[in-house]
């Protein structure tokens, strides 16, 4: 299978085909270590001197999306609001692009707004228009056709009337997405993943799932519903998640969603809503407060209902149907926890979640966690906990030298067959400098023969990380590297493809 996490710009600017960066004006310095340039106007600029751009929060489209742009235009046809996309906007001659925005008029009457695709030499290579005249939020849609190829184009919004405009959710999507889906995946990148023939997809993390601090734990409910109502989230890898890429399918693989076990990453350093002092801003932060655990557990159960519930008879099944998927996903697995330190705080909350899922949904296999290494305290205590509770499967992670994989062919030969099954959820061979080369790929291939031989114990495997965008990597090696116009599978990719 494959493991997808939004690291290395894997989602926004990557697999998610949206071409506009900071479309929701929700970037904030806290996304990026208090970088003051990473703010609500990041990636946006004003061309011309007769207009100003500011950010407002009064009467937004939705409380989950509180910031929007105020474009105050004092000279018609002479100023533009520009967006440079993610390292530029790549366009293909003759292809169509879906444009949309939410807009309203704050002062004046508004009017026609030109929407241009502009190459880096300032040549207009695509144009359409929308009308922004309403005093209330209203979505406008149009289609642009690129008249030439471009590697680093920009989007230009040019009001034709003097007015003060409120704008939000400014979006540009290629019509040629993977399988032609609206709000879909970048076609070439998604096809490269599909060519691995994954039997399952683990998502959304990884570290993203349990987050940097309790308030950064991945809230799956914020990733579904209309795009303008989704709740953006700070990415602990140092950037922003629009969460346009939500909980749905596109490759026919089994879903393996991962939820936090009521605790954030043990390396957290961001204060939670209940933190009382600097000490309680660190580590697992005491876990989700016990008075909030009932609701947290209900959120876990609601995810299963969203995936499997009857679209006519259940609350969350109905929401899935409203999203365009009345047929259940037939969810079989759910991960609880990720590489966690097995502390009393973790154990108490994991037990509560595990017992609730087992009682309500015995048909769903809960996957526990045994820490980030193939040995050590968390590995041993995690296995002891799984054995005590009867957890049906555990998630093992390890990043090791090629030599370890070569000399540990018997690693799973001696596992107790009466205990939990294993999901090797994250692994890779690491060399100094972190290349993905023939040596690492051969070591991984050799090790997978031993894993396959022990298929009665190790039921699932996935390499990590999966994707990395040039110039935006937080981790190496990765399986697939890409930029706006190219996708470059590594040698290790072909190892995974052979086993797929």
Specify the residue positions occupied by each region the protein language model found.
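Structural preference for beta-strand elements that scaffold enzyme active sites
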Residues: 1, 195, 200-202, 254-256, ...
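Extracellular and organelle-lumenal recognition/adhesion modules and their flexible linkers in secreted
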Residues: 1-242, 273-283, 290-291, 361, ...
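Conserved, mostly hydrophobic/aromatic
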Residues: 2, 25, 101, 197, ...
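Solvent-exposed loop/turn segments at secondary-structure junctions
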Residues: 8-9, 206-210, 261-265, 338-342, ...
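The substrate-binding groove and active-site-proximal loops of carbohydrate-active enzymes
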Residues: 87, 171-183, 229-244, 261, ...
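Acidic-and-aromatic substrate-binding clefts and catalytic sites of carbohydrate-active enzymes
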Residues: 108, 133, 264-265, 311-315, ...
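An active-site-proximal structural segment forming one wall of the substrate-binding cleft
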Residues: 144-156, 162, 175-199, 203, ...
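Catalytic-core region of carbohydrate-active enzymes that cleave or remodel glycosidic bonds
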Residues: 247, 351-365, 383-500
């Amino acid at each position: 299978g494959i493991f997808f996490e939004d690291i290395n710009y894997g989602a926004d600017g990557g697999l998610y085909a949206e071409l506009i960066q900071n479309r929701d004006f929700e970037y904030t310095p806290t996304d990026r270590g208090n970088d003051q340039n990473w703010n609500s106007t990041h990636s946006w600029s004003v061309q011309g001197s007769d207009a100003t751009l500011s950010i407002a929060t009064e009467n937004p489209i939705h409380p989950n999306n509180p910031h929007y742009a105020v474009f105050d235009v004092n000279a018609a046809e002479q100023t533009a609001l520009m967006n440079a996309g993610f390292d530029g906007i790549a366009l293909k001659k003759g292809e169509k692009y879906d444009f949309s925005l939410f807009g309203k008029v704050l002062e004046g009457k508004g009017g026609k707004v030109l929407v241009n695709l502009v190459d880096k030499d300032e040549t207009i290579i695509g144009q359409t228009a929308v009308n922004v005249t309403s005093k209330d939020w209203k979505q406008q849609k149009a289609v642009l056709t690129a008249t030439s190829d471009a590697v680093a184009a920009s989007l230009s919004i040019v009001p034709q009337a003097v007015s003060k405009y409120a704008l939000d959710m400014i979006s540009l999507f290629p019509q040629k997405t993977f399988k032609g889906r609206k709000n879909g995946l970048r076609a070439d990148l998604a096809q490269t993943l599909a060519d691995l023939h994954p039997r399952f997809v683990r998502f959304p993390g990884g570290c993203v799932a349990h987050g940097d601090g309790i308030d950064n734990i991945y809230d799956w409910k914020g990733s579904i519903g209309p795009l303008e109502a989704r709740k953006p989230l700070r990415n602990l890898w140092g950037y922003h998640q629009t969460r346009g890429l939500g909980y749905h399918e596109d490759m026919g693989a089994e879903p393996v969603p991962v939820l936090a076990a009521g605790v954030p990453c043990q390396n957290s350093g961001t204060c939670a809503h209940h933190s009382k002092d600097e000490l309680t801003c660190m580590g697992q932060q005491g876990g989700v407060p016990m008075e909030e655990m009932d609701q947290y557990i209900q959120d876990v159960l609601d995810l299963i209902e969203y995936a499997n519930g009857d679209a006519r008879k259940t609350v969350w099944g109905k929401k899935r149907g409203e999203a365009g998927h009345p047929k259940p996903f037939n969810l079989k697995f759910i991960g609880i926890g990720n590489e966690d330190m097995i502390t009393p705080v973790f154990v108490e909350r994991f037990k509560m979640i595990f017992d609730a899922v087992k009682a309500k949904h015995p048909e769903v296999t809960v996957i526990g966690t045994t820490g980030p290494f193939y040995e050590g305290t968390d590995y041993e205590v995690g296995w002891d906990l799984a054995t005590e509770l009867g957890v049906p499967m555990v998630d093992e992670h390890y990043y090791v030298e090629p030599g370890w994989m070569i000399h540990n062919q018997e690693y799973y030969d001696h596992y107790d067959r009466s205990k939990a099954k294993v999901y090797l959820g994250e692994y890779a061979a690491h060399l100094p400098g972190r290349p993905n080369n023939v040596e690492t790929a051969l070591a991984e291939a050799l090790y997978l023969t031993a894993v396959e031989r022990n298929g009665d114990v190790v039921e699932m495997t996935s390499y990590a990380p999966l994707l990395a965008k040039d110039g935006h990597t937080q981790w190496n090696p990765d399986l697939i590297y890409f930029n706006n116009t190219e996708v470059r599978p590594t040698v290790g990719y072909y190892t995974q493809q052979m086993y797929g």
